[in-house]
């Protein structure tokens, strides 16, 4: 993952690994420069331990993929697929001006053993 630095040379970390189920079909659009954008929703559920207590963790987050390199690969992502997403988080504003946290994916793996090789996007 990318690590950027502040002017003071302190590292700024922004990386996320989240697994879950694909909760929507992949939608495609283009930005004003003609670059394809793909997006879908990922639902995560797990049990986490915090201060020696178990708690249920749940979230639903939009996954964003930008670029031509994802055009064929996104066709493999189906509703209900179990995947692991590697990327960074960012805030998008919706049509009402409300901020929404999203994850920009850089790498996705299928968790389902029926998918060949398990990896959707090779690491660069």
Swiss-Prot record:
GO molecular function term, any single one: single-stranded DNA binding
Cited InterPro entries: NA-bd_OB-fold, Primosome_PriB/ssb, Prisomal_replication_PriB
DNA-binding listed as a keyword: yes
Domain SSB: 12-112
Listed GO CC annotations: primosome complex
Key words of the record: DNA replication, DNA-binding, Primosome
UniProt record, GO biological process: DNA replication, synthesis of primer
DNA-binding listed as a keyword: yes
Subunit (UniProt): Homodimer. Interacts with PriA and DnaT. Component of the replication restart primosome. Primosome assembly occurs via a 'hand-off' mechanism. PriA binds to replication forks, subsequently PriB then DnaT bind; DnaT then displaces ssDNA to generate the helicase loading substrate.
Family: Belongs to the PriB family.
HAMAP family per record: PriB
NCBIfam families: PriB_gamma (TIGR04418)
Function per UniProt: Involved in the restart of stalled replication forks, which reloads the replicative helicase on sites other than the origin of replication; the PriA-PriB pathway is the major replication restart pathway. During primosome assembly it facilitates complex formation between PriA and DnaT on DNA; stabilizes PriA on DNA. Stimulates the DNA unwinding activity of PriA helicase.
Name this protein carries in UniProt: Replication restart protein PriB
The species this protein was found in: Actinobacillus pleuropneumoniae serotype 5b (strain L20)
């Amino acid at each position: 993952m990318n690590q950027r630095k502040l002017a003071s040379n302190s590292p700024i970390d922004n990386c996320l690994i989240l697994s879950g189920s694909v909760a929507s079909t992949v939608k495609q659009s283009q930005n004003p420069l003609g670059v394809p954008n793909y997006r879908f929703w990922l639902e995560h559920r797990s049990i986490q331990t915090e201060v020696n207590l178990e708690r249920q963790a749940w979230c639903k987050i939009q996954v964003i993929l930008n670029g031509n390199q994802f055009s064929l690969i996104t066709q493999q992502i189906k509703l209900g697929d179990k995947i692991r997403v590697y990327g960074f988080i960012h805030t998008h504003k919706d049509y009402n001006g409300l901020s929404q946290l999203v994850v920009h994916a850089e790498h996705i793996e299928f968790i389902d053993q029926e998918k060949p090789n398990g990896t959707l996007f090779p690491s660069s």
